[in-house]
Regions:
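Amphipathic alpha-helical segments of tetratricopeptide repeats
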Residues: 27-31, 67-75, 109-113, 149-156, ...
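Conserved alpha-helical positions within TPR/SEL1-like repeat arrays
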Residues: 44-52, 81-96, 121-136, 163-177, ...
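Coil residues (strongly favoring Ser/Thr
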Residues: 13-14, 36, 57-58, 65, ...
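Alpha-solenoid helical repeat architecture
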Residues: 1-2, 34-41, 74-85, 117-125, ...
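Single-residue signature of alpha-solenoid repeat helices
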Residues: 20-22, 59, 103, 143, ...
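Hydrophobic positions within repeat-based interaction scaffolds
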Residues: 57, 101, 302-305, 309-367
Length: 368
């Protein structure tokens, strides 16, 4: 395992910058590995590289092989460490595919296995992943609680300040969801101090989410500024395909809200095929929402109706995305003169808005 850990420390910064290189080097390491546990750690690392290349089927196959090994092995702290890596990776793949509830289950299992393992140095990372997942499910109080736990682990593990920025931009996301933009900006500023030390995918998270924070306060010029930086970053790395198309979708909606219909159509068209190819349900729900509104702004009611009938409906939808869909459906029914249905979607959004103070109260209770 010592050889694997040395290799991991050497290669980890290349994971998001050049996952193809990581695949090649890791396969070479696997061919000479003599320790079976280390071999399957290499395999999980290979799965991470496949995920960054958006090759989800290959990532799943690698994780399945590693889990079969664990299931047949004698229980031990080393096997628990490997289980933790597998379930953390499964959670990350679920996030990429928009399977929000499943990601919570996987990250919780990863955390539980890590507690029973021999390497607790990654507890803060898994805590951050679990916090992110709870925020996506709308459980902002639980998300904030896990971010605070991550900070506590950072303290006990003596993680330096320059490596704590994922917690800060995570907390910023919580406050963005609650529309407390003063606290949101405070935590984004803390994260921004370490921007030069972030890996490319971390820079993308910061830029994209900070752009979203301006989107939600209807400051579209500032949102565009951050989304454009995010797109430029993603296009600088050939394997950041997911990040590139996610940013294109955000640009598309921002232009839509600015009534720049041609630019909106251009960016939404760029990202459509990719998200359909990986079957990311959350992204497709979001994309379908934008395409409905785009048809309305193009004065094409029949196309809007067609897109509504074909739009996917995931088992779970994040409150923000439901709010956006409801707003555009209200617009559609106003256009066709069905004011009863338009009023229904207006009231649904009022219900979502009314739930935010309750979430904020729960969050404050956890902080005190």
């Amino acid at each position: 395992m010592d050889i694997y850990m040395q290799y991991y420390d050497f290669i980890i910064d290349s994971l998001s910058k050049n996952p193809s290189y990581v695949c090649t080097r890791t396969a070479r390491q696997m061919s000479v590995a003599t320790d079976s546990v280390a071999y399957y750690h290499y395999l999980v690392l290979l799965a991470k590289a496949y995920m960054f290349k958006s090759e989800m089927d290959s990532a799943k196959l690698s994780m399945d092989r590693a889990e079969v090994f664990c299931d047949g092995a004698e229980p031990s702290s080393l096997i628990n460490d490997l289980y933790a890596e597998i379930y953390n990776m499964r959670g990350n793949v679920c996030v990429r595919q928009g399977l929000t509830d499943s990601s919570v289950v996987c990250f919780q299992k990863a955390f539980d296995y890590r507690l029973k393992g021999s390497n607790r140095d990654m507890l803060h990372d898994i805590s951050i992943n679990l916090a992110d997942a709870f925020v996506r499910t709308g459980h902002y109080d639980k998300g904030a609680m896990w971010y605070r736990k991550a900070l506590s682990y950072c303290d006990s593990l003596k993680i330096p300040e320059e490596k704590r920025f994922p917690v800060y931009y995570g907390l910023a996301q919580v406050y963005m969801e609650l529309r407390d933009f003063t606290s949101c900006d405070h935590y984004y500023e803390l994260a921004a101090r370490q921007y030069d030390k972030m890996l490319p995918f971390e820079k993308h998270i910061y830029l994209n989410n900070r752009g979203n924070s301006y989107y939600f306060r209807a400051d579209y010029p500032n949102a565009l500024e951050f989304f454009r930086k995010s797109l430029l970053l993603a296009r600088s790395y050939p394997d950041m395909i997911f990040e590139e198309h996610l940013t294109e979708m955000n640009l598309g909606e921002t232009f839509l809200l600015m009534n720049q219909v041609d630019s909106a159509a251009y960016y939404l068209n760029l990202c459509s095929d990719f998200f359909r190819s990986i079957e990311n349900q959350t992204a497709l729900y979001y994309l379908d929402t934008q395409l409905i509104e785009l048809a309305l702004k193009q004065n094409n009611l029949s196309l809007a109706r067609k897109r509504m009938s074909e739009a996917i409906q995931p088992d779970y939808v994040e409150p923000n995305m439901q709010h956006i869909r409801n707003r555009y459906l209200q617009h559609y029914f106003e256009e066709v003169g069905d004011f009863k249905q338009a009023y229904y979607y207006q009231m649904e959004n009022q219900r979502i808005d009314d739930s935010t103070p309750v979430s904020y109260t729960h969050l404050r209770a956890h902080e005190t």
